[in-house]
Amino acid sequence: MKRLLPTLRADQTSESLISVINTIQIAAKEISFRLHQGALAGVLGSTLDENIQGETQKKLDVVANQLLKTLLLESPNVHAVASEEEDSIVESPNSGHYLVAFDPLDGSSNIDINGGVGTIFSILRKPEGEETSENMFLQPGKAQVAAGYVLYGPATMLVMTTGKAVRIYTLDQTVGEFLLTHEKAEIPKDTKEFAINMSNRRHWADPIRAYISDLLEGEEGPRGKNFNMRWNAAMVSDVHRVISRGGLFTYPWDARKPEKPFKLRLLYEAAPMAMLVEKAGGKATDGYSRLMEIVPEHIHQRVSVVMGSANEVDVCMDYHKQHPKPY
């Protein structure tokens, strides 16, 4: 089986970008080890702190963030990083040409129950001649030069693209290397699976409520077929299922907290996942517009997300076209 770095070179990826990806995979291996140690490593449970999102930090949130931040800022090819766990960007002492945004541990509420979690990352080029500031990161998803995630499940898997195919690598624990196990992930155009947090149904806007209601009616409803619902409470796990076998994943606008009507962050969650889904043949939108076209207004901006099998995303968007935006 091919290893990660030789595969990237065969794809004609630049050595500077390979260096950044290599740094991420080194951090991911350490995070994977800590996770698999579980209670033995004393890293389960929560801290007493909250991150910039107002969310209580898990101990492993802090560990994963520190690992990624430290290693990336040591890279000569990284100029600055942005993280879910950091209030603002963190500048490197080096004059690298890449910017890295990441969610160090997506789905961290699953840690204490031994559920699936993951690391999501986005790599952008530093705009030439621009002073170091948050504005450097405010680029649309289509500007990404690479995107991916690491899923820490029964196996640790790296799923990524440098703008070509979406490749899947599995960590071989015996040699400590990510080996290529899937040359080209392709999302089926049609599906009978969807993933959504149904507990928020009463707070949804009309388009998504109508869409999900029709799915639940199955063969007797307007869709004329039965659908299965899946929900892992971790974007990485739910999107990995979509990339592996198709489906639709959505975390829509809701009215629970008017000041925070969206859940997922554009820069380091929605945009990198959108790049992966599109490169695997799917579609990714906010219900109205292509996610890859949206320019962030700040690094922690949140958005509505609908992504997955292309034909099913189109159907969901048709429901949205029948109603005005709720925001």
UniProtKB/Swiss-Prot annotation:
The keyword Hydrolase applies. SUPFAM superfamilies: Carbohydrate phosphatase. Keywords: Carbohydrate metabolism, Cytoplasm, Hydrolase, Magnesium, Metal-binding. CDD domains: FBPase (cd00354). Mg(2+) 1 binds at E84, D103, L105. Mg(2+) 2 binds at D103, D106, E269. Its cofactor is Mg(2+). Substrate binds at D106, G107, S108, S109, N197, K263. Pathway: Carbohydrate biosynthesis; gluconeogenesis. Pfam families: FBPase, FBPase_C. PANTHER family: FRUCTOSE-1,6-BISPHOSPHATASE-RELATED, SEDOHEPTULOSE-1,7-BISPHOSPHATASE, CHLOROPLASTIC. This is Fructose-1,6-bisphosphatase class 1. It comes from Idiomarina loihiensis (strain ATCC BAA-735 / DSM 15497 / L2-TR).
